[in-house]
């Protein structure tokens, strides 16, 4: 018997930024590579990553991920100065950087990371052009989500 091999790209999620989906309306998503050091890759493999308060800034025509926390493993060499909060360069094409930068400058949008995942053997970050939610919008989203959950619960019990 032959086993079917799926043609889907292997994509395993490492870390999610749930706060970004709560605080922003996502307009458009992009996938970017990250410039990492060796100890950072090991920390990512161990799952020691947090994207909660991170965001993207543009300096000198390049995109940088700020505020992502990668905790170093306890066995990182002592001669290295492991900085868990350092700025990490994002690898994007020039047209993508131009589009993101233009939207941030002209429309007042924000670029936030949504998740960190493996794509084949590379660490990728999914970033999004996003518009901030007001407090009443956040409450409305929560009400809508709870109503959907309650509706499914009732249909399941009576169905």
Curated annotation (Swiss-Prot):
One Pfam family from the record: SmpB
Assigned keywords, A-Z: Cytoplasm, RNA-binding
Superkingdom, natural source: Bacteria
Keyword set includes Cytoplasm: yes
GO cellular-component term (any): cytosol
Transmembrane feature ranges: none
GO molecular function: RNA binding
Free-text function comment from the UniProt entry: Required for rescue of stalled ribosomes mediated by trans-translation. Binds to transfer-messenger RNA (tmRNA), required for stable association of tmRNA with ribosomes. tmRNA and SmpB together mimic tRNA shape, replacing the anticodon stem-loop with SmpB. tmRNA is encoded by the ssrA gene; the 2 termini fold to resemble tRNA(Ala) and it encodes a 'tag peptide', a short internal open reading frame. During trans-translation Ala-aminoacylated tmRNA acts like a tRNA, entering the A-site of stalled ribosomes, displacing the stalled mRNA.
Name of this chain's protein: SsrA-binding protein
């Amino acid at each position: 018997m032959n086993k079917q091999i799926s043609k889907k790209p292997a994509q395993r999620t490492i870390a999610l930024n749930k706060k970004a989906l709560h605080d922003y309306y996502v307009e458009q998503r992009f996938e970017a590579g990250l410039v990492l050091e060796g100890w950072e890759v090991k920390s990512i493999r161990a799952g020691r990553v947090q994207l909660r308060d991170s965001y993207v800034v543009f300096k000198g025509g390049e995109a940088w991920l700020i505020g992502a926390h990668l905790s170093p493993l306890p066995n990182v060499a002592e001669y290295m100065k492991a900085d868990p909060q350092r700025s990490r360069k994002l690898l994007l094409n020039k047209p993508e950087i131009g589009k993101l930068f233009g939207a941030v400058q002209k429309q007042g949008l924000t670029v936030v990371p949504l998740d960190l995942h493996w794509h084949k053997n590379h660490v990728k970050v999914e970033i999004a052009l996003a518009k901030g939610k007001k407090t009443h919008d956040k409450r409305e989203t929560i009400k809508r989500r709870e109503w959907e959950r309650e509706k499914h619960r009732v249909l399941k019990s009576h169905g």
